[in-house]
Protein backbone atom coordinates (compact mmCIF):
# COMPACT_ATOMS: atom_id res chain seq x y z
CA UNK A 1 0.00 0.00 0.00
CA UNK A 2 1.08 3.53 -0.66
CA UNK A 3 2.67 2.51 -3.96
CA UNK A 4 2.49 5.05 -6.77
CA UNK A 5 2.61 3.96 -10.41
CA UNK A 6 2.76 6.33 -13.37
CA UNK A 7 1.42 5.32 -16.77
CA UNK A 8 1.20 7.31 -19.98
CA UNK A 9 -2.08 8.89 -18.82
CA UNK A 10 -2.37 8.40 -15.05
CA UNK A 11 -0.64 8.67 -11.73
CA UNK A 12 -2.17 5.80 -9.71
CA UNK A 13 -1.83 5.60 -5.93
CA UNK A 14 -2.64 2.31 -4.17
CA UNK A 15 -4.23 3.70 -1.00
CA UNK A 16 -5.30 0.55 0.88
CA UNK A 17 -6.50 -3.04 0.75
CA UNK A 18 -8.19 -5.30 3.26
CA UNK A 19 -11.17 -7.36 4.27
CA UNK A 20 -14.52 -5.59 3.97
CA UNK A 21 -17.59 -6.33 6.09
CA UNK A 22 -20.87 -4.71 5.13
CA UNK A 23 -23.36 -3.40 7.66
CA UNK A 24 -26.11 -4.47 5.25
CA UNK A 25 -27.44 -7.93 6.13
CA UNK A 26 -28.22 -8.57 2.44
CA UNK A 27 -24.66 -7.95 1.27
CA UNK A 28 -22.78 -11.04 2.41
CA UNK A 29 -20.19 -13.22 0.69
CA UNK A 30 -20.92 -16.84 -0.08
CA UNK A 31 -19.92 -19.46 2.49
CA UNK A 32 -16.15 -19.79 2.88
CA UNK A 33 -15.50 -16.41 1.23
CA UNK A 34 -14.95 -12.82 2.29
CA UNK A 35 -15.03 -9.47 0.54
CA UNK A 36 -11.82 -7.56 -0.13
CA UNK A 37 -11.80 -3.81 -0.71
CA UNK A 38 -9.06 -2.09 -2.72
CA UNK A 39 -8.87 1.71 -2.63
CA UNK A 40 -7.09 3.78 -5.29
CA UNK A 41 -6.51 7.38 -6.30
CA UNK A 42 -6.23 8.21 -10.03
CA UNK A 43 -4.87 11.50 -11.36
CA UNK A 44 -5.09 12.29 -15.07
CA UNK A 45 -1.57 13.38 -16.10
CA UNK A 46 -2.37 13.59 -19.82
CA UNK A 47 -3.59 16.54 -21.88
CA UNK A 48 -6.94 14.93 -22.77
CA UNK A 49 -9.95 13.44 -20.98
CA UNK A 50 -9.37 9.91 -19.65
CA UNK A 51 -11.86 7.30 -18.43
CA UNK A 52 -11.57 5.18 -15.30
CA UNK A 53 -13.91 2.22 -14.81
CA UNK A 54 -14.73 0.35 -11.62
CA UNK A 55 -16.01 -2.77 -13.36
CA UNK A 56 -14.13 -3.00 -16.68
CA UNK A 57 -10.43 -2.52 -15.93
CA UNK A 58 -9.80 -4.92 -13.04
CA UNK A 59 -9.13 -8.63 -12.41
CA UNK A 60 -8.40 -10.16 -9.01
CA UNK A 61 -6.62 -13.43 -8.28
CA UNK A 62 -6.58 -15.24 -4.95
CA UNK A 63 -3.82 -17.87 -4.88
CA UNK A 64 -3.68 -17.58 -8.70
CA UNK A 65 -7.42 -18.34 -9.13
CA UNK A 66 -9.71 -15.67 -10.58
CA UNK A 67 -11.96 -14.01 -8.01
CA UNK A 68 -15.39 -12.53 -8.71
CA UNK A 69 -15.80 -8.78 -8.63
CA UNK A 70 -18.64 -7.51 -6.46
CA UNK A 71 -20.77 -4.40 -6.67
CA UNK A 72 -21.34 -3.30 -3.08
CA UNK A 73 -23.39 -0.24 -4.03
CA UNK A 74 -21.84 2.25 -1.62
CA UNK A 75 -21.19 4.95 -4.26
CA UNK A 76 -17.42 4.74 -3.77
CA UNK A 77 -16.57 3.43 -7.23
CA UNK A 78 -13.84 4.82 -9.44
CA UNK A 79 -16.05 5.52 -12.46
CA UNK A 80 -15.14 8.89 -13.92
CA UNK A 81 -14.18 10.79 -17.03
CA UNK A 82 -11.30 12.91 -15.81
CA UNK A 83 -10.24 16.13 -17.51
CA UNK A 84 -6.52 16.86 -17.68
CA UNK A 85 -5.13 17.37 -14.17
CA UNK A 86 -8.27 16.09 -12.42
CA UNK A 87 -8.41 13.19 -9.98
CA UNK A 88 -10.75 10.68 -8.40
CA UNK A 89 -10.53 8.28 -5.50
CA UNK A 90 -12.57 5.14 -5.06
CA UNK A 91 -12.77 1.42 -4.42
CA UNK A 92 -13.19 -1.92 -6.12
CA UNK A 93 -14.45 -5.05 -4.34
CA UNK A 94 -13.84 -8.75 -4.88
CA UNK A 95 -15.05 -11.95 -3.23
CA UNK A 96 -12.12 -14.22 -2.30
CA UNK A 97 -11.75 -17.49 -0.35
CA UNK A 98 -11.18 -16.82 3.37
CA UNK A 99 -8.09 -19.01 3.42
CA UNK A 100 -6.34 -17.19 0.55
CA UNK A 101 -2.63 -16.69 1.12
CA UNK A 102 -1.97 -14.30 -1.81
CA UNK A 103 -4.40 -11.76 -3.28
CA UNK A 104 -3.38 -9.74 -6.33
CA UNK A 105 -5.29 -7.16 -8.31
CA UNK A 106 -4.51 -6.48 -11.98
CA UNK A 107 -5.31 -3.13 -13.57
CA UNK A 108 -5.58 -3.18 -17.37
CA UNK A 109 -3.78 -0.04 -18.55
CA UNK A 110 -4.91 -0.33 -22.16
CA UNK A 111 -7.80 -2.46 -23.38
CA UNK A 112 -6.19 -2.90 -26.81
CA UNK A 113 -2.81 -4.06 -25.50
CA UNK A 114 -1.63 -6.54 -22.90
CA UNK A 115 -0.32 -3.96 -20.43
CA UNK A 116 -1.22 -4.56 -16.79
CA UNK A 117 -0.16 -3.33 -13.39
CA UNK A 118 -0.25 -5.86 -10.55
CA UNK A 119 -1.06 -4.63 -7.04
CA UNK A 120 -0.45 -7.01 -4.13
CA UNK A 121 -3.22 -6.90 -1.54
CA UNK A 122 -2.02 -9.81 0.57
Model segments located where?
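Conserved functional micro-motifs across diverse proteins
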Residues: 1-122
Amino acid sequence: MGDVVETEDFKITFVSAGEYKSDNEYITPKKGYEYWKFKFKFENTSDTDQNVSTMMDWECYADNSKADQQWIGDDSGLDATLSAGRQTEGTVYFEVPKDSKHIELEYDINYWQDNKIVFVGK
